[in-house]
Amino acid sequence: KNKEELQEMINQDKWDDIYKKYPVADGNFVYLPAGCLHAMGKGNVVYEIQQSTDVTYRFYDYHRKDKDGNERELHLKQAIDCLSFDKDIDKNDVHPVVKVHENVKETIFISNDSFTVSQLLVIGKCQYKCDNYQLATVVKGSGKVDEYDVKVGDNFLIPTNTSIELDGQMMIMMTTK
């Protein structure tokens, strides 16, 4: 679709014609490049890597109303101007690279000039060396990072050229530049 077709469908409230639904299962990784209109469905957890910004543009808000009965403000022009219409997200162009270390499986989902996203599946005690800084989020299970207890939802930073001890049964999402 192009900007004009999108704007016309929005004007006609034809949201089902605008988006595509993709089935996902636990553990799937779906890469959506910047500029892709997206939303998540019920039960999904999103690990979104983005540049720091204080702006969010709202395309649609389910016609929800505030306490005064008014629909919340939408930012259609600004949002449409930020979209890339040349992206083919049907391909989900991800080619994971898997590395197995002692008691940890590392899956590198995507690595480009802007960022790298990987996943660690920890199944016991192991040493993990980081060449670059890492932003880490525990997404399943629990365990220890060095002497610190961690669980689902916990985040931590790993400095450049640091070795850490991981122990437990957990899945950790990692991001670096």
Predicted regions, residues:
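N-terminal non-catalytic cap/leader segment that marks the start of a structured domain
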Residues: K1, Q12, M173-K177
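Glycine- and acidic-residue-biased ligand/ion/polar-headgroup-sensing regions
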Residues: K1-N11, G43, Q119-Y148
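Loop-centered beta-sheet repeat module
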Residues: M9-Y57
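Short acidic-glycine-tyrosine-enriched beta hairpin
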Residues: I18-Y31, V45, K144-S163
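Ligand-binding loop in jelly-roll beta-barrel domains
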Residues: G35-T56, D149-K151, T160-K177
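C-terminal amphipathic alpha-helical segment
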Residues: Y57-K125, C130
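Active-site lining segments that contact anionic ligands and/or coordinate catalytic metals
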Residues: V104-K105, S114-V117, N132-Y133, K140, ...
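Short, well-ordered beta-strand micro-motif
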Residues: Q119-L121, L157, M174
